Amino acid sequence: MVETDVLLDAFTRVYESLHRTLADITAAELIQEPHPPIGWLAWRLSRVMDSNVARLAGREQLWIGDGWAARFGMAPEPADFGRSATHTREQVRVFRASPELLLAYHDATYERMKTYLETLTAEDLARQLDEPQYQPLPTVAVRLVSVLETAMTNEGQITYLKAYHRLGGWFPSEAKDPASFR
């Protein structure tokens, strides 16, 4: 379906880029200054996808239902997806997760996103959400674009921070493998 192909393409780009960026990341780089660190940003990217797709699809979050919260050593709180209003600077600073755990959770959220997008019709995308705090009321398509915006922003921050830590700034042309910073 044309309406969802563009969204699937965009989410696939985030998926592939996150895999390239985290493939050879070290534990020290996941928590290195400046903040927020790469590890927390990668976690947040996946949490935002998980929480929003679960709500849109009327399903339980993978974070809770599939035990990801426990694997991360965190409470299974459905509203905890890294909003600045819920995470303090200290909580972000002490966040720890391996690249493998971050990618495993992201893989699960990506697969759910992909499966969900493949089921949507034009009518589904046009459905208004019952969120009166927003005017006009957002549609499913608008929400998915918001989730995509967050994912792309977080992935861009992750890619920048990797270059910052390894090269002293955004100079991918100086890297041995410039594609690993794309």
Where are these regions (language model features)?
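Active-site rim elements
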Residues: 1-8, 30, 96-103
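Helix N-cap and loop-to-helix transition residues
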Residues: 2, 26, 37, 88, ...
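An acidic intrinsically disordered interaction segment
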Residues: 7-16, 115, 119-123
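Short, contiguous alpha-helical
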Residues: 8-12, 16-19, 27-83, 130-182
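Hydrophobic alpha-helical core bundles mediating ligand binding, dimerization, or RNAP-core interactions
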Residues: 11, 15-18, 22, 106-113
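A short secondary-structure junction motif
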Residues: 21, 25, 120-124, 161
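Acidic/histidine-rich alpha-helical segments that form the ligand environment
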Residues: 77-127, 142-149
